[in-house]
Amino acid sequence: MSSAATLAASLNTSLSMPLAGAPVAVIPAHHLMTFLLQLGLLLGLATLLGRLSARFGLPALLGELCAGILIGPSLLANAAPDLFAWLLPQDPARFHLIDAVGQLGVLLLVGMTGMHLDTGFLRRQGRSAAWISGTGLLVPLALGVGIGFLAPPEMIVGGTDPMVFALFLGVALCVSAIPVIAKILTEMRLLHRDIGQLILSTSVIDDVAGWFLLSVVSALATAGARTGQAALTAIALLAVFVLASLLIGRRAVAAVLRLADRGQGDRTLIAAVTVLFLLFAAVTHALGFEAILGAFVCGALIGSSPDLKVARLAPLQTFVAAVLAPIFFATAGLRMDLTELANPVVLGAGLLVLAVAIAGKFAGAYLGARIARRTRWEALALGAGLNSRGVIEVIVAMVGLRLGVLTTASYTVIVLVAVVTSMMAPPLLRFAASRIAPTEDEVVREEFFDALETPGQTPDKQFVTTAKEA
């Protein structure tokens, strides 16, 4: 053996062994190489396929999920099993590395979502948003729980409480996705329209309710107690956490932000915000809830701080959106196994879940809109727009799989529901919105924002005042 080969072998052996007296174990050289290769491949494919999806007018989420599907059990494991076993070994200790990066990504993504929560906007929408969101949540939740009790054994992990599985499925089917909906409304130039504002405000309420419902159901899954007792305990702990966040957490967050603002540049502020996200996430996780709830609540507290300009956190948002979030969704695709759909029982159950998800959300939103005295076309537009599940449903599915509530088959079905509903929402919304005549106020707002977006053109003072009042 050459001296170079001997040195390489010696180095590999030394890196594979824990160092005496080291505070933490050292990652073996081969494991580190595999991890870096996984990370680079997932990010590269997710970015490429995400851009390709966007080029065809589809959500980038679809391409990012496909990145994981391509090199996961659905395709690579069948086309090249040896390569799959080498690239993605089924050793949990090794897969946890890539999973940890994805979890960090989703924590920061949800935290940034919470930062953009506009409570004033919700108050302005008032009664209509409350009715639409209430029925839009309850109808699909009830239907999802109902079919959850009818699910075949292939969809449920052995030993799982049927009530917990049914609740998980109900939560997955009742949520809506703010990022996907906001992107659709922006691309269709509906954000300035009253219907666009109402869809967005209702989806915000859905999003907030979704995180809390997910946390309660997750607590039930891990409580190991009777469902009723565990539910009461979870709700009590959740109420204590929210109250403490409003009374103590808000002041603590404001103090940290003021302290960080004294640093030079935005780097200290970005680091402080990241630390706050992680600490709040750790607290909710310690209480038995999902860590993402803590990140969301922390984001809402940060966003409500009058001293913070959210634009200063743009570098963090860019990094999360461009790097960490695509890796998370690619890892979500890795856990899908489309070959499960070859089982007629799973395929039939999947089609039923998809039909219930679409019909339940549509019927609930339509009913709420009609109760709020909206027109038929406005109700149809709301049903179509709120049907987009996207990001939050993928997160719900990931949580269910990690907690051992969902099988690979049921996980795959739920993620496919997120993909299909995100793809079908734009054409249905476009069809309904085109039949809603714009009001004079909406025309003024559209002209105002067009003027802002046109280089070298500034609306006059009277025009600005009129647009804002509209």
What are these regions (language model features)?
Residues 2-470:
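Transmembrane helical cores of multi-pass secondary ion antiporters/exchangers
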